[in-house]
Amino acid sequence: MIKRFVFGKPFDTEAIINKPKQEEGNIPYFEKNGNTFSYEMDDKDIVWGLGENVRGMNKRGHKYTSWCSDEFEHSEEKQSLYGAHNFFIIDGKTKLGVFVDCPGRVDFDIGDTEYSKLYITIENSCFEIYLLEGSSVISIVKEFRQLIGTSYIPPKWAFGIGQSRWGYGSEEDLLKVQEGYRKNNLPVDMIYLDIDYMDNFKDFTVDSNKYRDFKSTISKLKEDKIRVIPIIDAGVKVEDGYSVYDEGIKNGFFCKDKEGKEFIVGVWPGKSVLPDFLNKAAARWFGDKYKVLTDMGIEGFWNDMNEPALFYSEKNKQEVFEHLAEYKDTNVGLYANFAMKDAVNLMANNLKDYKSFYHETDKGKICHADVHNLYGYKMTKSASDSLERILGKEKYLLFSRASYIGMHRSSGIWMGDNKSWWSHILLNLKMLPSLNMCGFIYTGADLGGFGSDTTEDLLLRWYALGVFLPLFRNHSCLGSREQEPYQFKAVDKFRGLLNLRYRLLPYLYETFIDSVKNNEMYGSPLGFVWTDDEDAKRCEDQLLIGDSIMIAPVYEQNATGRHVYLPEEMKLIRFKGSEIIEEELMGAGHNYIHCNLDEICIFLRKNKKLPLAKEAASIEDLDWKDLTYIEY
């Protein structure tokens, strides 16, 4: 049963496609004190959800803030990352789903201040709360997913291998990646372009000095069954003569300050303006700009910097420099030193800036801070709407960094700028079910880690998780170690894992489609299925993929294996590379499983079967019908 409670006159986020009637009277389960709602938790209550966030699948014991943030450090103390996914389920004697539909800031204190208390504090006075009552967590997830609409489905080739790096700055770099994969007999379907391809970081441009014939290069790579996927950023460079800027200024399509002047911010190009994606005409205009690149043969994009990320605002920058000037001729001691550092460090993504510009909507002018979490969603929807007109439904790849529930109908997301840390393998595993609950099924991580330097063993272990994620992409940061698999001596081991990805795709793709069409989980915590098994419910490092297989990746350096809990009897299938080297029936209970760097262990459930394709160099070469089956 779904109950909808409305407070004030909320802005319609369009997260919900079929709104139930509004309930009258007080909201049950919670005590209301102003805009704070409190819930008394039992000792054994688990709280699942909240999408893309740090820490566990069980969110109990921490504070989380729903505020799309340009956050490069995904460490345990963080409270916000790139997405705003305000849906969670309390799993205990009471099974209760809660969705807070508010595009501004929302704080969740889930047993942090008081272990037995869950607090929701909403900054805005206008919002909606949906309560979903059900007999099980899975039934509540299914009901919520029906409420928010069908998730995005990309083309089949988007399930292939992707290679990316901030630093592919020329046609030669692209061709070197192609050569590296083909020469080493490594399968690949996509090469991603970061901001390097643009002319001075201007959206919908190509640097002709680096790419002498971009369209021809795209065509040649496509002949080799490789698609090129460029990045698009939210900020538009301030430059007279740049058509996107000129058109936006002429039509009033950029966000403005309270005086009605374009709000100038700093991002990659320096001084930039922000398209007003809550203005429907502006959104359509910006979305149609993707045609500049689709006309060159591009069939996929990734949207970035769309929280929106701000290095500074022009106004705030001036205030910071004026503040720093006060210290120029002084004896700078401890506290003054901290004050100077804070002035500079807090210049980026400053709350004061987010409260200083406005959107023109169907409901009139609205302050950005009140709808902040919709910015990336509406940018990506503008792209999706246009790409569907240009290329057709399910014919384009699109994913975004920032997101809000509702955007899942338009695109996927990636899990953001992680680091080459062993702990982030586990973090990315934990994110998957939380995102699935919120409708984001096409998702994946920067395999190997975006920031810092990866190592051969770290990348191999990360690939052992990535093999099962819908979005498979190796991505790294400018200045970090190059981490294409052919850069390492263990290229044979990488080849085996990549080949296994393609062999598993008949199962993974069917699982993905079933998850979308039936509003089911792609990756589930064990506790969603074995609801009366306390060990299963507390297991935070294993997942069910679909309803047939369980995975338990190794995520600790120098480990030769790991503890695995089996809630029921299963068949262990051990792959060395893409070949099966062992099948063993294992009883329910706690086990230690050895697993070498070039091995992946899959656990097949009873009365299930796992289809396997033959190896292929690309998705287009994959034979989806000539399959063998492992059964139990």
Please give the residue ranges for each predicted region:
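Glycine-rich, histidine-containing beta strand-loop boundary motifs that form or position
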Residues: 31, 41, 50-52, 91, ...
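Extracellular structured ligand-interaction cores
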Residues: 82-86, 93-95, 103-105, 126, ...
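Aromatic- and carboxylate-enriched substrate-binding clefts and catalytic-loop regions
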Residues: 187-494, 529-530
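Generic recognition of flexible, low-complexity loop/linker segments
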Residues: 73-76, 84-86, 148-150, 177-180, ...
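A residue-level signal for conserved active-site and pocket-lining positions in enzyme catalytic cores
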Residues: 87, 144, 181, 221, ...
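Catalytic and substrate-binding clefts that recognize carbohydrates or anionic sugar/phosphate headgroups
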Residues: 1-155, 165-167, 171, 178-183, ...
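Short, hydrophobic/amphipathic alpha-helical packing segments
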Residues: 63-68, 81-84, 175, 283, ...
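Catalytic core of carbohydrate-active enzymes
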Residues: 374, 380-396, 402-413, 427-431, ...
